[in-house]
Every structure is written in C-alpha cells, then in structure tokens.
Amino acid sequence: MIAYFDTSALVPLVVEEPGSRFCARLWDKAARVVSVRIAYAEGRAALAQAHRLGRLTSPALREAVSQLDAVYGQLDRIEVDDDLVRRAGLLAEEQALRGYDAVHLAAAERIQDRDAVLISGDAQLCRAARQMGFAVSQPQ
C-alpha cells in the first residue's frame, strides 16, 4: 500500500492523540509513505501551536520536533511547483477546501496508483478525496 499522509495524520505520529495508534498502524503497514514538502512547515506550526496552548511542554515540543524530523526524513516528498498550486487552486474552488488541504489533495493526485490511500483527520478533505475516487482512511 502507498499511504499519502496529510499533516493531520503526520502529527499524531509524533504527539499522542486519539488517532495516534491508527496512524502508526497505517504508517507501519505502508510499503511507501508520501506527503507534500510543505507538510513539514505545517507540522511544525501545529506543534508550536500545541506548545503555545499548553498542550506540550518545552521539552515535549523539542522531542516532538525531533520525531517530526525523523518522520519527514522517511517520507517520499512531492514537490510544490506551479502546476501543483494551480491544480490546488482549482480543487479549493471546486471542492470547498482550505488552501493547504487543496495542496495535499493535488499532491496525492500525483501518486497515480490504485493502491494509494489518503490518510487525513480532516473531514472535508476526506470527503473531497472520496468524491474524486480516492481510497481514504480517517483516524477516529
């Protein structure tokens, strides 16, 4: 299985959340794990916000960033280029997606493999992906 992880599925790999075990099982099961290059910046932003909100202590933030670095290093990364952002813009409009979610969906389209599964905790992104024919796994 090729697993495309959006940021909402990557963060539970490095911070204990309700979907952490689910995401870890899919990560371990995948023959190949893929995301878009900007997932790192988006993940760091999510970890920093968790720290600002008091959900992560400073040492826990440093550990989570270290783990995110390791996870990111194992990903096959899809590059953000002009074609991708233009496709994402169209998907944002057609599928009522936020910008980064549209970028994730446009990136997942580039995999072009029947065994690919999009993994996301975002209900709107999952809905749009299903409408477009993707196999989807959503952490509960």
Descriptions of predicted regions:
Residues 39, 66-95, 102-106:
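Acidic catalytic patch
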Residues 25, 64-71, 77, 125-139:
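Anionic, Ser/Thr-rich low-complexity intrinsically disordered regions
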Residues 1, 30-33, 74-76, 112-117:
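Short active-site oxyanion
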Residues 43:
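Entry/capping segment at the start of metal-dependent catalytic domains
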